[in-house]
Design a protein with these regions (language model features):
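Hinge/cleft segment of the Venus flytrap/periplasmic-binding protein
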Residues: 276-319
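Extracytoplasmic "Venus flytrap"
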Residues: 31-51, 66-76, 222-227
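Pocket-lining segment of extracytoplasmic ligand-binding domains
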Residues: 172-241, 247
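Short, low-complexity disordered leader/linker segments with a strong preference
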Residues: 1-31, 56-60
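An alpha-beta-alpha
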Residues: 32, 50, 138-185, 287-303
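Hydrophobic alpha-helical segments within soluble ligand-binding/sensing domains
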Residues: 27, 120-162, 261-282
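Short beta-strand elements in bilobed, periplasmic/extracellular small-molecule ligand-binding domains
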Residues: 56-77, 136, 182-200
Length: 319
């Protein structure tokens, strides 16, 4: 009997010791929840860069990623974030504005890093913006120099008069970009008209209206536009209206040129931030929002040929 009792106690002690220090993955690995807004290439590249950088910093055997896509739905973002919190993940990557908003609403303790977010002040309703979110939130911004995006239009289409600004009205960061770019273009002598659509159901109709009224169209970094680039291309290319975009993925399908950052590099910066937070080298509450150092002029050779547009030196083919 004593031997049986001793054996039971030994098993219980072993189980207790095994449970010490475990994370949700059942090991001592860091568990990272990634909530990505949409399945398009810019966001995919940001997620990939993040995972590569964090894996390189911590070691492949030290980190596990839970990567989920919200399919463009806010409610799904909230559900994904709630699932991560229930699982007690070590850090959340919110890839795009809506996942960031959902994560900030859901937790003030679990570290949250945003990426592919254009303007944190707008996204988080912080009018007194200092570059620091504070608390348990920081991240990276994908905001390329908007004055340089306007300058691309001036360089390629100096004879144009009317610029259509096409964007999704439900994306606050798109409104921010369009407002800024409109100011730059107006100062350059262009007449700008906004063409805002609600969702994919009215995108084609709004795009047709933009084509009818515009010599050239500008599309900001807009996740909804990026998800439905084929819909846009099916309207603008037959209409013969060139599109300058805020990101490379939209340009690759529907545009002729862009001045864009590398979303992979953006993800790398975010992954390096995550590593410093998880290892205790940095305090997220004092970590300012970061960006990548450079943006690149790119063009779409296929669409330029279709529309008879000659691109000057200094532009790289979009991937």
């Amino acid at each position: 009997m004593k031997k049986i009792v001793a054996l039971v106690l030994a098993v219980l002690m072993l189980a207790a010791l095994t449970g010490c220090g475990e994370t949700v993955s059942g090991s001592d690995k860091y568990v990272i929840g990634i909530c990505q807004m949409l399945p398009h290439s810019s966001l995919e590249e940001a997620s990939r860069g993040f995972q590569d950088a964090l894996t390189a910093a911590l070691g492949e055997d030290q980190v596990v990623f839970r990567h989920q896509d919200a399919g463009g739905e806010y409610a799904t973002c909230a559900t994904i974030i709630d699932g991560f919190l229930a699982e007690n993940v070590d850090l959340i990557l919110a890839n795009a504005t809506v996942p960031l908003q959902a994560a900030v609403s859901a937790t003030d303790t679990t570290p949250v890093l945003g990426t592919s977010v254009t303007d944190y002040a707008t996204a988080l309703n912080m009018p007194e913006w200092t570059g620091l979110v504070g608390g348990n939130v920081s991240g990276t911004t994908d905001l390329a120099p908007l004055d340089q995006q306007a300058a691309v239009i001036a360089e390629l289409f100096p004879e144009a008069k009317n610029v259509g600004l096409l964007y999704c009205s439900s994306e606050p960061n798109s409104v921010y970009q369009v407002t800024r770019v409109e100011g730059y273009l107006t100062d350059m002598g262009y007449t700008c008209t906004s063409f805002a659509f609600v969702d994919v159901n009215d995108l084609s109709a709004v795009c047709e209206a933009a084509c009818a009224a515009s010599d050239v169209i500008y599309i900001p970094t807009d996740n909804t536009c990026a998800m439905y680039t084929e819909n846009i291309a099916n309207v603008v290319l037959p209409a013969g209206v060139p599109v300058v975009t805020g990101d490379a993925s939209t340009c690759a399908a529907a545009g002729v040129a862009t001045f864009s950052i590398s979303y992979y590099d953006l993800g790398v910066v975010t992954g390096e931030m995550a590593a410093s937070i998880l290892t205790g080298e940095a305090d997220i509450s004092t970590m300012a929002v970061k960006s990548v150092d450079a943006a690149t002029k790119m063009y779409n050779p296929v669409n330029c040929e279709k529309l008879g547009i000659t691109i000057p030196e200094g532009y790289q083919p979009v991937a």
